[in-house]
From Swiss-Prot:
GO terms for cellular component: ribonucleoprotein complex; ribosome. It comes from the Bacteria. GO terms for molecular function: rRNA binding; structural constituent of ribosome. SUPFAM superfamilies: Ribosomal protein L20 (SSF74731). This is Large ribosomal subunit protein bL20. It holds the Pfam family Ribosomal_L20. Signal peptide: none annotated. Belongs to the bacterial ribosomal protein bL20 family. Binds directly to 23S ribosomal RNA and is necessary for the in vitro assembly process of the 50S ribosomal subunit. It is not involved in the protein synthesizing functions of that subunit. One of its GO terms (biological process) is translation. Keywords: Ribonucleoprotein, Ribosomal protein, RNA-binding, rRNA-binding. It comes from Thermomicrobium roseum (strain ATCC 27502 / DSM 5159 / P-2).
Amino acid sequence: MVRVKRGVTKHRRHKKILELAKGYQLGRSKLYRHANEAVLKALRYQYRDRRARKRDFRRLWIIRINAAARQHGMPYRDFIHGLKQAGVEVDRKMLADLAVHDPSAFGQLVEVARRAL
């Protein structure tokens, strides 16, 4: 059997990890073992937080819609239910945007929801 030398492979692997660890402090950016741990943990956080961001934004949109709907005398749950009854298919992201940037249009949607109930 021919002996396999792993120098180039190891160097490339280490270089890839140390490149990802750029900007970390102390040994976490210079030493392979520490950098590898830090990078793996960072990638786990990144994966988790990509999913959490979706939940956080939905929560924010709901809070904004609720606040705007209550200014028009209607709670969030009745507003959403009324929109569904009226057949209005506007997602929460757009509703929150309307509530912030175009309150008059949002008020018209509240009236549509109120009539549908």
